[in-house]
A protein has these predicted regions:
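Conserved phosphate-binding/catalytic loop of the ribokinase/pfkB sugar-kinase fold
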Residues: 116-120
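Glycine/small-residue-rich interface belts in oligomeric ring/scaffold proteins
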Residues: 40-45, 50
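A short acidic, glycine-rich active-site loop
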Residues: 37
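Surface-exposed amphipathic alpha-helical tracts and adjacent flexible/coil segments at the periphery
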Residues: 1-18, 23-34, 48-49, 55-83, ...
Length: 694
């Protein structure tokens, strides 16, 4: 099982390698989810790959952000550079970047980032079909789900075992971008989840979105038995000393050792938020998983000890064999071989006739084992010596240094990379004329007579609501297509009831599904449904749109992190939909904020609202069909008065999305859309369509 450690800087990389990492993951100056880390320039990247490969450590490059069309040429340059440097894998979020990696550097493995929100075997299967050789699972998964996925997965599985936990499923958090233009999907998360929030205007503030750090140091044997290929430590923003301490602890356990209470205390002192949690892994969510960063104990001595592990000397981690031949009248010969079969040779001086003492195999071995200060450990010496010869120790040492230097150069030399030229995808201008109307609701009770009379092209209804209202297909016009909204998270163990509901609505005549992640896409197609893509797929570029076209999607809702000019310019390889009204979904949460407040589930009794430091209220509702929470924006997105400006952008449809609205409020919005009245949206937002994100 691979130990994968973070490297936010060259110093952190050395800390990881010297403390037992099998692989490191790092980011370049651009296109990685930790843009506030020190990261690596082109020269740094080359140095890092050489340093790691010499020591038998793999390097995974993070390309795990969303990439805009105008940025694709720069992303292509980085991919080609990294491949030529010899990186061992790309960690990718964006579907368009996956396509780009496969085109430009087809021999470099692609790992599906946790930012892809993959949380089921179905999502893993879709990622494998996409060309990924490894999937990093969502942190929220319990042990039984991980075991099920590992048992049937066609690709390697990677699991986070230590470090920060986000309250939201990775890749589905828009809180930082919507309230401050700093997008987590672009590597700029401002971590507003770590701030205090109240449960109402008159309640004391708490930290209901701030989770403790994950720690699965005691679960590694279980993960190994499951078949997990790689365990991952979070922390590219952390100090090198932290990386050293945590990597060393997990290496100790992987090597069969046990962590003492003092070791666990060191982990907590290095960094924690009021302790650690294994709640997600154990399936035990709740209020005891939450904590916040506080000033802890003095770390000076602990960090000084950690620095010594990578600043003083170098661990000898690569076993090598030496082969020596000392013949009378011939130059001395020495060779060294590493475990990968790299063989390097050199010649030395002609040995002299011994006068006092002959060179023995023991003398030779003693000199050849002096590999201190290098990453190599001499494990064996084989020699063939003629008798009564003398060779100075200085000559043997010089030969040893020569072959070691040549071996180091060979191990650090990148294999020739197969690189292809960059090309732009074909452009599709989209649909001319007036965009269609689509409507999404949270409950069947929100479907009003006025809504049905407007004959929206598509009416999106949660799958569970559709299954419970078999009369809906008869109520809608033949000009309106019903589409089932799948639960945003469907663990493999939750698939059976979803499959039953899909069969039910199929028999009702529903033939379309709205999918927001790869797992949903797989489930829908397997069940025989046409697929429309939702915002959770995070589509921000033309290459991703082309991928969706290849997958046969009927339409795609573009990311609400795009600006209107970017929406205009993106290739409409599939019919493009735009959200113009509704509360933006900011977080999708496995932990129930409602239940954590009082210990009682409040899903059916009302809406909980979190209040931030400036008094902004954020409603929390449950994702239909599940008990998962969705944090909504306090302000409604409102672009109904901008419909004319949206013509000529190639859009297929404009979507109205209703969440907390009652039927009366919904009808007022619909009348506004029709131009029959002006809806007082109150405190509304134009979203990110004009502001954009960093």
């Amino acid at each position: 099982m691979e130990l994968l450690a973070p490297a936010g800087s060259m110093e952190a990389l050395r800390a990881a390698v010297c403390n037992g990492a099998d692989a490191v993951y790092l980011g370049a100056d651009t296109f990685n989810a930790r843009m506030n880390a020190r990261n690596f320039s082109a020269a740094d990247l080359q140095e890092a790959v050489v340093y790691c490969h010499v020591r038998g450590v793999k390097v995974h490059l993070t390309l795990n952000t969303l990439v805009l069309d105008r940025e694709m040429p720069r992303a292509a340059e980085l991919i080609r550079l990294a491949a030529s440097c010899g990186v061992d894998a790309f960690i990718v979020q964006d579907l368009g970047v996956v396509s780009l990696c496969r085109q430009l550097a087809p021999d470099v493995p692609i790992h599906a980032s946790t930012q892809m929100s993959i949380h089921s075997l179905e999502g893993v299967m879709e990622a494998a079909a996409l060309g990924c050789s490894r999937v990093v699972l969502a942190r929220e998964l319990p042990a039984e789900e991980i075991a099920h996925i590992c048992k049937k997965s066609p690709v390697e599985i990677e699991v986070f075992v230590h470090g920060a936990l986000c309250m939201c499923y990775s890749g589905q958090c828009y809180l930082s971008s919507v309230i401050g233009r700093r997008s987590g999907n672009r590597g700029q998360c401002a971590q507003p989840c770590r701030l205090p929030y109240g449960y109402g205007r008159f309640e004391s503030t708490r930290y209901p979105l701030s989770l403790k750090d994950n720690c699965l140091a005691g679960e590694l044997d279980e993960l190994r038995r499951m078949g997990v290929a790689s365990i991952k430590i979070e922390g590219r923003m952390k100090r090198p000393e932290y990386v050293a301490i945590v990597t060393r602890a997990y290496r100790t356990v992987l090597n069969g050792g046990k962590l003492m209470p003092s070791d666990l205390q060191e982990l907590e002192t290095a960094f924690s938020r009021q302790g650690f949690t294994d709640g997600y892994f154990r399936g035990q969510t709740g209020s005891d998983m939450f904590g916040r960063r506080q000033e802890g104990e003095d770390t000076a001595d602990l960090f000084a000890s950690a620095r010594a592990t990578y600043e003083q000397g170098e661990p000898q981690r690569i076993g090598v064999r030496f082969y020596a031949m000392i013949r009378r009248g011939e130059p001395a010969q020495l060779a060294v071989e590493d475990p990968d079969g790299n063989l390097c040779r050199t010649r030395g001086p002609v040995p002299e006739q011994a006068v006092y003492r002959s060179l023995t195999p023991q003398d030779l071995e003693q000199q050849l084992k002096k590999t201190g200060g290098t990453p190599y450990l001499c494990t064996a010496v084989r020699s063939s010596l003629d008798p009564d010869l003398m060779l100075p120790a200085s000559a043997i040492n010089a030969m040893r240094r020569d072959v070691i230097a040549e071996l180091t150069a060979k191990r650090g030399r990148a294999a020739p990379a197969r690189l292809n030229a960059y090309d732009e995808p074909p452009r599709y201008d989209g649909i001319a004329g007036e965009p269609q109307l689509t409507i999404a609701v949270r409950t069947a009770g929100q479907i009003t007579s006025r809504m049905l009379s407007m004959k929206p092209t598509v009416l999106y209804v949660p799958l569970s609501e559709l299954a419970e209202h078999p009369d809906l297909p008869q109520r809608v016009s033949v000009e309106t297509q019903l589409a089932a909204i799948l639960p945003r998270v469907i663990w493999s163990g939750e698939l059976a009831p979803v499959a039953r509901q899909l069969r039910t609505v199929y028999e009702m005549g529903v033939r379309q599904v709205l999918a927001g992640n790869l797992g949903q896409l797989h489930i829908a197609r397997t069940a025989g449904f046409a697929v429309r893509g939702d915002f959770g797929l995070n589509i921000v570029n033309s290459r991703a749109m082309r991928y969706l076209r290849e997958q046969g999607l009927d339409s795609q809702l573009l990311s609400f992190e795009l600006t209107l000019p970017q929406i205009r310019d993106i290739s409409k390889a599939v019919p493009a939909e735009l959200l113009i009204y509704g509360r933006l979904p900011l977080m999708l949460m496995e932990n129930c904020v409602m239940k954590n407040r009082t210990g009682i589930c409040a899903c059916q009794t009302g809406t909980v609202r979190l209040v931030d430091r400036v008094g902004e209220e954020f409603p929390i509702v449950k994702d239909p069909g599940t008990c998962r929470n969705v944090l909504l924006n306090g302000k409604k997105l409102y672009l109904l008065d901008k419909k004319d400006a949206l013509r000529g952008m190639g859009l297929w449809a404009l979507r109205l999305q209703f969440t907390t609205e009652n039927p009366g409020e919904i009808d007022k919005v619909l009348m506004d859309y029709q131009g029959r009245a002006v809806f007082d949206a109150g405190s509304y937002t134009r979203g990110l369509y004009s502001r954009g994100v960093e």
